[in-house]
């Protein structure tokens, strides 16, 4: 995908496959607002200016298990820096579905700890604009986060809202988020909800 028209076509394709706007946003590594804009522009329903966002394509990493393992190993190394600085350790690695899970699996293996999976609320949005009322959930097929020190892993931070709701869920269940690690950070914050953020790449706009 090289331009906005390619993005619109891909967004339409994903919608036709049954994905909701929150899921489309994850697939294209854009904000939910940008995904909605792409879909409404495709239907000629908006003349609004595009949201300020950056499209990320890391599929050359994601489709290769060896590359994925190498990248996740780098993320584990970044996490180690935070844990040493805080003089703490980790009980469970939390992968944010979908793209954060394979990365988190490698990081959990590196540390010899359990893997938890959290499904963001936006994945259960009905596209009525009420997605913020939907709460994230911890998958019952993986480890729980109750009373545990957690490291959160995802591929991209865009607005940070998914991270914020993930941290809140962990805290509500008596756990503690001690670090966040991502491949790409588009938000540019050193912390989210007072949890340190580590990134392999940080992207900033010059407007």
From Swiss-Prot:
A biological process term (GO) from this entry: UMP biosynthetic process
GO molecular function: DNA binding; orotate phosphoribosyltransferase activity
Keywords on record: DNA-binding, Transcription, Transcription regulation
Keyword DNA-binding: yes
Pfam families: Pribosyltran
The keyword Isomerase is assigned to this record: no
InterPro entries to which the protein is assigned, alphabetical: GfcR-like, PRibTrfase_dom, PRTase-like
HAMAP family cross-referenced by the UniProt entry: GfcR (MF_01214)
Family: Belongs to the purine/pyrimidine phosphoribosyltransferase family. GfcR subfamily.
Free-text note regarding domains: Contains an N-terminal DNA-binding winged helix-turn-helix domain and a C-terminal regulatory domain (or effector binding domain) resembling phosphoribosyltransferase (PRT) domain.
The protein's name: Transcriptional regulator GfcR
């Amino acid at each position: 995908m090289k331009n906005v028209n390619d993005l619109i076509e891909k967004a339409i394709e994903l919608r036709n496959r049954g994905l909701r706007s929150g899921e489309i946003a994850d697939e294209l590594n854009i904000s939910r607002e940008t995904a909605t804009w792409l879909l409404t522009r495709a239907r000629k329903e908006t003349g609004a200016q595009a949201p300020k966002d950056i499209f990320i394509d890391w599929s050359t990493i994601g489709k290769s298990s060896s590359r994925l393992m190498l990248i996740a190993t780098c993320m584990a190394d970044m996490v180690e820096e935070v844990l040493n600085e805080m003089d703490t350790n980790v009980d469970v690695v939390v992968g944010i579905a979908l793209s954060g899970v394979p990365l988190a699996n490698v990081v959990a293996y590196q540390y010899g700890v359990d893997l938890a999976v959290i499904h963001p609320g936006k994945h259960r949005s009905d596209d009525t604009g009420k997605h913020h009322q939907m709460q994230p959930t911890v998958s019952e097929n993986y480890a729980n986060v109750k009373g545990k020190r957690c490291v959160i892993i995802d591929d991209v931070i865009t607005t940070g809202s998914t991270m914020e709701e993930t941290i809140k869920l962990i805290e509500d269940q008596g756990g503690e988020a001690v670090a966040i690690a991502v491949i790409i950070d588009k938000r540019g914050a050193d912390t989210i909800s007072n949890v340190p953020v580590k990134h392999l790449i940080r992207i900033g706009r010059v407007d």
